[in-house]
Every structure is written in structure tokens, then in C-alpha cells.
UniProtKB/Swiss-Prot annotation:
Keywords: Metal-binding, Mitochondrion, Oxidoreductase, Potassium, Pyruvate, Thiamine pyrophosphate, Transit peptide. It comes from Dictyostelium discoideum (Social amoeba). This is Pyruvate dehydrogenase E1 component subunit beta, mitochondrial. One of its GO terms (biological process) is pyruvate decarboxylation to acetyl-CoA. GO terms for molecular function: metal ion binding; pyruvate dehydrogenase (acetyl-transferring) activity. The gene is pdhB.
Length: 356
């Protein structure tokens, strides 16, 4: 149609005129491959970036996140360490102070407890204690939260632990695009970022748009995303639990309840504005997390909404959390301790008074 209009206006314009169209191809990618591609692209982009951790090099990582990177970049940039989290965490902090950009991989964040002194006392506080003169551009990454059948000592969610610390940014991505964009933003940040993954998400597949596949695609730290719009209730979650929130929204829709789902993406700083704007529409809120209720992310969001959105609330806020026990090993007890989709559905029905 554009060609015919131009023909009428000025035939001579058509001599070298072509209508250029661009197709936006989506690509299905696992979360594992999304993280791997982000690491690869940032290693190629900046020679100051390197990866250090247990089995990250020749073994390609315990979960194969670093597959192929040792062969491509060599042992000077993909560095295997002994099983001494406190040791290589301290080396990472010092290297970051010296101007490099370390990515420290923990086989699980449960093992990062051995290194928590360096993460909090060295890494998080350096910029403040130096009066803004010394930066600490380091990424602390690895699986967080409960996987399956690994017992109490390997199943904790550390979002609230690190989310309470000034000087840290804390992210917990869900989709493949989240993982790519937030990891790139974390690596390029001039101060420490705790990057919480989920072992149970590694094999999940998501579509990546043309834009999300771009090497310069970034997800801003501190910005939540509305994954599904709704008008009756707001459901807020992060990391793997967003999948359960989306499933719950589908079930609720069949029962006439329109749920808005917010993917928090960043734990610190929390994007309170996006939640407040959602509450202006729905007037009801359910928070969901895999961690414990006391002093958790849901508790913090509830406090923020009391301060910034009290007048918009038509019902008490519901918090759905993991059971207040160390994670059991027996599968039936483990299922009882973990958040299930039906827990979210029931909470949404309670706040909308549709549970009768």
C-alpha cells in the first residue's frame, strides 16, 4: 500500500525505493543456556571479567552452566578452586578491589555460608567504608532455594538474608530473558550483586525475542515486571515460584478471578512502585516465596504496602511461604513443606472472599 501511495505522489521516488521489513524471530532457550550465553558474551566483551569457583573449568560447572567457557577462554579466566569457599571468596573481593570483575560461583548458596563474612563484611561494605573511593564489582552467583531430595542443609532460600544487607544488590530471575538481562547488568555493575538462581529452573524453556537475544540486552536491577495483568488480586513472587503464580492465575481465571502476577526480579532494592500501582487496580495482595515467613520478603513487602498503599487495600495481605521447619528429606514431607500452586489459589480466594 505504501508503494502505491508513493507512486501517485512521485513516481521518480520509486527508482531506488524498497520497503524493508524485519522479522522478529523468537528462540526457545533453557535457563541454563541463557545464563551460559550471558557469561560467554560478557567474557568476550570485557577482558577484566573472569569466573572462579569449584568445578567451573574442566568439569564445565556442577550444573554445566559454564559449559565450553574453559575451552574458549582458558584457565586464566575460568578458574577451578579447591573446596574452600572462604578462600576463593576472599580472593574475589581483592581482585574486584584491584579493578577486575570476578564472577564467583557457589555450587549452592548453602555453601556460601562459609564465605558470608567476605560477602557482607568485605564486599558489601567496601564502597561505603572507603567514602565512595573504592568499588567492588563482583557477582556472587549460584543456585538458591529448595531443589528436591537434598535435605535440610542444602535447601534454604537466602533471598531475605542477603536482601537485608546495605551495599548489596540482590536479584532472583525467573525467565530466560530475566537470567540473561539481569546477569549482564550484574556483571557491569560497579558494586556487588548477589545473583540467586534456582536449580529447578535450569531445564525450564522460555522463548527469547529478537531483542532479548541481543548482546546488549539488559534488564535493569530494581525493576519488577508485570507478567500477567489482572483486576481482582495482585500476586507477587520471584525466581522459580513465579511459575506457580502463573499457574495459579490460570486456575483462578477459570473460576472468574482475574489475577495480576508480578515477577519481582530484584529483591534489593524492591520495586515497591510497581506493586503499589497494581494495588490501585486490584486492592488485594498475595505474596509468595519459598523461604520462611519470619523476616521474609513477603513481610518486607507487607510493611512497604502498609507505608505506601494502605488506603488501596480492601483486605489483609496474605503471605504464602515455605513451612517454618528445616526442609525434610522424605518426599511426602518435602512436598508438604514447599509452596504448592494450590496454596496460592486458596490465598487469592480468601482475599477476594471467593472461598465460600
Amino acid at each position: 500500500m505504501l508503494s502505491s501511495i508513493l507512486k501517485k505522489i512521485q513516481p521518480s521516488l520509486l527508482v531506488n525505493f524498497r520497503i524493508i521489513t524485519r522479522t522478529y524471530a523468537t528462540k526457545e532457550v533453557t535457563v541454563r543456556d541463557a545464563i551460559n550465553s550471558a557469561l560467554d558474551e560478557e567474557l568476550a566483551r570485557d577482558e577484566k571479567v573472569f569466573i572462579m569457583g569449584e568445578e567451573v573449568a574442566q568439569y564445565n560447572g556442577a550444573y554445566k552452566i559454564t559449559k565450553g567457557l574453559f575451552d574458549k577462554y582458558g584457565g586464566d579466566r575460568i578458574i577451578d578452586t579447591p573446596i574452600t569457599e572462604a578462600g576463593f571468596a576472599g580472593i574475589g573481593v581483592g581482585a574486584a578491589m584491584a579493578g577486575t570483575r570476578p564472577i564467583i560461583e557457589f555450587m549452592t548458596f548453602n555453601f556460601a555460608m562459609q564465605a558470608i563474612d567476605h560477602i557482607i563484611n568485605s564486599s558489601a561494605k567496601t564502597h561505603y567504608m572507603s567514602g565512595g573511593k573504592v568499588f567492588n564489582p563482583i557477582v556472587w552467583r549460584g543456585p538458591n532455594g529448595p531443589p528436591t531430595a537434598v535435605g535440610a542443609q542444602h535447601s534454604q532460600c537466602f533471598a531475605a538474608w542477603y536482601g537485608s544487607v546495605p551495599g548489596l544488590k540482590v536479584v532472583a530471575p525467573w525467565s530466560a530473558a530475566d537470567h540473561r538481562g539481569l546477569l549482564k547488568s550484574a556483571i557491569r555493575d560497579d558494586n556487588p550483586v548477589v545473583y540467586l538462581e534456582s536449580e529447578l529452573l535450569y531445564n525450564y524453556k522460555f522463548d527469547l525475542s529478537d531483542q532479548e537475544q541481543d548482546k546488549e540486552y539488559l534488564v535493569p536491577i530494581g525493576k519488577a515486571k508485570v507478567e500477567r495483568e489482572g483486576k481482582d488480586v495482585t500476586i507477587v513472587g520471584f525466581s522459580r515460584i513465579v511459575s506457580n503464580c502463573m499457574e495459579a492465575a490460570e486456575i483462578l481465571a477459570k473460576e472468574g478471578i482475574s489475577a495480576e502476577v508480578i515477577n519481582l526480579r530484584t529483591i534489593r532494592p524492591i520495586d515497591a512502585e510497581t506493586i503499589v500501582n497494581s494495588l490501585k487496580k486490584t486492592n488485594k495482595l498475595v505474596t509468595v516465596e519459598e523461604g520462611w515467613a519470619q523476616s521474609g520478603i513477603g513481610a518486607e513487602i507487607s510493611a512497604l504496602m502498609m507505608e505506601h498503599a494502605f488506603d488501596y487495600l480492601d483486605a489483609p495481605i496474605e503471605r504464602i511461604c515455605g513451612a517454618d521447619v528445616p526442609m525434610p528429606y522424605a518426599s511426602n514431607l518435602e512436598n508438604a513443606a514447599m509452596v504448592q500452586t494450590q496454596n496460592i489459589v486458596n490465598a487469592a480466594k480468601r482475599v477476594t472472599q471467593r472461598n465460600k
